[in-house]
């Protein structure tokens, strides 16, 4: 294996010191001269006609600079299918609906003004259950649609499921259900909007999609009558995303409108309670599944149908069925597949991208049912998975082209570390059980848009310091650190010589955004390409460079390394001759020569990497990603039969990552994702009653805390993907995908009880124990 100096090293995150010392500036820390503060009035009803809005009292309050409703401003619409106006008129469809907004000299005055706005409503019947919402006589959320079923036909068919079911030796079928959970980023959302005298807009926003937000805000300016105005987005330090910042929201456009009306910068940030109430969630789903296998335990078919709660409007959450198709069609070798999903409008909150993007929901059903099918066939669950595991070179029913794949190795690692065979065959300890589940996720980008690309500009100064302008966004996952290591490796410099600039759309290249675990693969490849061009430029210069100096006696000397740049290397801030390693010249000296010599040149280069993956066609088939990430998680649990509490004794997480660019950050991703997955499985639930969030705080929303940290054992399996930067694949999302089914399977092994609804709280476990008795 090649010897590497930066790649594969356990280098701390670049922003770690700034964060722990309080130097990092988040959106909450930013203040612009003359800034006003915005607040938003939202609906008191989940479904109602708006009869009247009276803002007169709010406008009279000292310190208020503007009050706006839908009647006062252009009607900007947003969302995946643009079904949502920024400020509502006519009627409201959820408690999240924005009716009016205030800009004032301080947040307290703005809050007081909001309470002075009077709204008269005419309540309408609400519908909060997707099954009820599909009935012919259900209240319509959007009357113009004539139905509450979203007109996006999520359907995938490959092979003949009906015939395969008839010929299967064993069939297992069941129903599973998952509910709302939310992102719980430590950094809540916020934005500052500021116009100059030419109506150009500058935005400070903690977003995952600066380039796409730039496009959306540009469209908003067109609606406002300024098609030629410019948009600039500056990102502060971002305290987590997990998909929550993968779209533009109403509050952003409201900040823009208030800034335009007042001609002052306007800042809107969310409180923690507002974050719980008004941030989009993971999409709830009701899932029916059937799978079959032959006598040898080889899968014959998989058949799944789903009903998903779309909420009152359509955000990116409505597209999660496109990712649910991935494990349904391509987790294990399954020749015949059928999948259909319906997204249904209700008066509940609407959903958004969230880490895993539909994959955790689908995998919970698939891997719980795989356990049932293994039991029906009489085959050990681990062996059953090995018999059906994906392999390199495979083309799945959805036409995914599997390149690197170490799923079998991951399953075997879980079995070995949990001592699977002995625990399954030996005497059982009461209340204890082991379980496992596998995963597939995109690991080489995902062509959701027309482009899946990312740009990079690399520039070197006189002294060998490297500036990398990347389109990628660091939202806490360590993208800056990884890109720095890749560039350092490619150029032969030290990681500390590399500076990453990723905060400003005026200077940074275009990128489609932080989603689909794509940053290491796509932005990494882009950075490597640009760095390689710069390295080649430097070596070309070095080949023609003559080093001249005088010794202490005043004698002149000169040296040339080699006429052929292929015989030169950069290492530790020096350029060396490969043939004569004792011959070396300081990198900075060569670079200064390029700038000061006659006919000098700039040492910089750009690259744009767009993987040759495919958009899914009308049948939802195509090679969505350039590479696929695989993994398997194994869990040992202990269940208290008196309380129903599930204690995780061991948690093994084996991941095929291609190559670990930074094992320490990679392990951190696995730790964090597994903790999020365990929360999804056991504790987390956003409780809605008739559309209203009932637990909008960390006291009542049971997020795992430091005292609940599980004993995760990360296992890194390197399959070396030929298309990845130095062999790497994405890892950001996969680590939470199989947690819930692995735990559910372990609980079944411990108690003989199959839990089919998340979260598997002590109350639900205890109820199941009592029902079994």
Language-model region placement:
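Short Gly/Pro-enriched turn/cap motifs at secondary-structure boundaries
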Residues: 11, 90-92, 181-184, 279-282, ...
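Flexible, low-hydrophobicity surface segments
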Residues: 1-152, 171
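Short, aliphatic-rich beta-strand segments
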Residues: 38, 201-205, 465-470, 648-650
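C-terminal catalytic domains of large/alpha subunits in multi-subunit enzymes
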Residues: 60, 70-71, 224-230, 259-268, ...
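Short acidic, glycine/serine/threonine-rich loops at helix termini
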Residues: 77-81, 113-116, 205-206, 214-216, ...
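Glycine-rich loop/linker segments at domain edges
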Residues: 9, 15-18, 147-191, 284-368, ...
